[in-house]
């Protein structure tokens, strides 16, 4: 075991309070450096400090939270791992696929399973295969319903002159993974069925792109309906309105002035909307999960 893995092994045999005592010893009066592609880590740190102060009122800790854009977090952590002593005490990463390929398979991050969690689930840390997810979030298609337009088919989001608000695929790889997912036979078949449910005039707009993608789908070894998936992906990537984060997307869509606009975003963002004369969650409808 590496030195880090030995520490993890010790920690997996400790209760939460024992871990907290250890954290107090290690960090009291120091600065805690964290990095993540979500602000949730920064929001959690004051609560962490508050918890440790409930055990030791004299405890204090400063913190510095970095939130790199454009998926730079993996490069940052890789560089940090090459130092004799790393800077970051914590990371929060949203993309399980890349954590596996870029962080754990490379030996940069190791898995920690809390003793009390394992006991509550009738297992032991050694027996747990995989990772503990902090949370699973649903990204949903939403649209502003202050007008007469209705989005009742997934092809509506890539229709002519429609520019859905979407966190750019180079900023958050979850969105890119969603597009890859559509090429799976199950989802490609759903896209075909949705296309067949469209009126003839709308089908006529999409058909040339679908036909264009047929050879591409064959070259990629996709299933019989792969051309529908590639067509939707091509139209989506060519039309979406790139945004830096889901928060601004939500703020735009809930406004009275965003009539008929649509977007793909985390559903939980609606919780932070403050109702006012021109802003309301009632201006939003969820079109599809």
Kindly give the residue locations of the regions a language model identified.
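N-terminal low-complexity, Pro/Thr/Ser-rich intrinsically disordered segments
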Residues: 1-27, 210
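CheY-like receiver
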Residues: 22, 76-80, 252, 256
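Extracytoplasmic ligand-binding site segments that recognize negatively charged/polar headgroups
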Residues: 30-50, 63-78, 86-250
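Periplasmic binding protein-like
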Residues: 80-90, 257-262
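Extracytoplasmic/periplasmic substrate-binding proteins
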Residues: 224-230, 237-289
């Amino acid at each position: 075991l590496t030195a880090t893995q030995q520490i993890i092994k010790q920690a997996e045999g400790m209760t939460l309070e024992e871990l907290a005592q250890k954290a107090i010893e290690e960090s009291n009066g120091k600065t805690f450096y964290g990095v993540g592609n979500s602000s949730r880590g920064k929001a959690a740190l004051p609560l962490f400090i508050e918890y440790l102060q409930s055990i030791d009122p004299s405890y204090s800790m400063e913190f510095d939270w970095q939130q790199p854009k454009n998926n730079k977090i993996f490069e940052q952590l890789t560089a940090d791992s090459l130092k004799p002593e790393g800077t970051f005490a914590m990371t929060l990463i949203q993309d399980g696929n890349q954590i596996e390929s870029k962080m754990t398979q490379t030996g940069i991050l190791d898995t920690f399973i809390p003793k009390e969690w394992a006991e509550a689930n009738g297992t032991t840390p050694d027996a747990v295969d995989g990772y503990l997810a902090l949370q699973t979030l649903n990204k949903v298609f939403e649209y502003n319903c202050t007008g007469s337009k209705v989005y009742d088919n997934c092809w509506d989001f890539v229709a002519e002159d429609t520019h859905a608000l979407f966190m750019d695929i180079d900023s958050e790889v979850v969105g890119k993974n969603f597009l890859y997912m559509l090429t799976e036979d199950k989802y490609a078949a759903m896209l075909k069925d949705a296309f067949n449910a469209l009126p003839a005039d709308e089908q006529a707009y999409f058909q040339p792109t679908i036909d264009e993608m047929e050879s591409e789908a064959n070259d990629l070894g996709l299933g019989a309906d792969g051309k529908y998936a590639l067509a939707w992906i091509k139209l989506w990537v060519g039309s979406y309105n790139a945004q830096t984060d889901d928060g601004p997307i939500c703020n735009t869509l809930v406004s009275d002035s965003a009539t008929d606009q649509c977007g793909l975003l985390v559903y939980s963002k609606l919780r932070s909307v403050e109702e006012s004369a021109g802003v309301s969650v009632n201006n939003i409808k969820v079109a599809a999960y």
